[in-house]
Amino acid sequence: MAIDEKTGFLGVTGDQAQIASEEDHDPILNNGSTPDAAGLIQSVSLRSGYGQLKSAATAAFFGINHRGAGNPIPLNTDQYGLTFFTRPRLNLSYDNITRDRTLAPMMSMRRDSIPRAIRAYLDPVGARLGNPFGGPAGVAVAGAASTTAYPSTLVDDQSAFISVLTNNLVSMTGWPDPYTDTYTSKSGLYKEEWTMIDGIAKIYNKFSLSTNFRNIVGDPISYLFYVWTQYASLVHEGVLDPRPEMVIENEIDYQTRIYRLILDPTRTYVQKMAACGVAFPLSISIGASFNYSDDKTFNADNDQVSVEFQAMGAIYMDPILIKEFNDTVVMFNQAMHDSTRRSTYIKLESVYKPLFNYIGYPRIDPFTMELEWWVSKGDFQTIMGDTGLLGDTVRPLSK
């Protein structure tokens, strides 16, 4: 160190100044690489038998790794993604639920109560005044039932899915693997045999899905499945009646469809998709909540709710699932139809999605497999205004 003659302050010596100057011009320190770094890396990769790193995936498809030098392609890193449960169509009208005492709590007049929310989830028709494809809840339309609607402030009447199940699903197991039967001939003199495919690889049989849900405050999931299973049993017994249109069309009203969407690491694109034909809950671990032990204050057995579903048919990687998923969304919210969606909703760009978590309606682009989220223009203006980003131009917005 030396004293600067002009300022009188300590400064660097000539040697130190030279070192600092060299550091300022060091491309590795400033840019993280040298101008020919890419070429050097490529040369090392080629000499080692790995091929060009930037085209490793292409090379694996095109040719044979005859040097056995290893494969630099990264492993698949798909996320578990999302699981959607479509809403069934139970008949939880006043005349029905008054026939069984265990269903009576759903007569609650409080729109923010859990029993009222369960009633709205499981009976979307009644929650919208008998109009499954109509306007806002509580607004009568031509031909709609004259009974009083029972919407809930905790349930989006225009959503086709049971959100509380999607948001609290911990695990799901039991999806079957495709399997093909074979025929094998009788053995010959030298025990020679021949074999061939002798069956179908499609999955049309029944199977069980085991699910576990996080038991959140108020225990709404246990009550939801309790009502669901009790209703199905009481309909079979003849105590409760399905809606007339379900009887006429010979449909089962307590069934749901489970969609499984495997997403990429950014949760932007659907990598794989599956669904069962239909499913319905069979059992629920409600008994565990009544276990007792004086060793602990809180019942740890009730941390999760276990539910077994009976499913029929498994559909994997079928493009028709994209259309059926989108059609299901439109069935509950006609404004999401391709002809009207852009006049009512705004597609969220990735940079804005965290602001609108828990808000919006999904759509899968059939060409790019992007999982889009659309929010109403009113919600968009409100939330962007509340966060001070209304005039944000970070990215152009889809209109």
Regions found by a protein language model. Name each.
Residues 2-399:
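Glycine-rich, low-complexity intrinsically disordered segments
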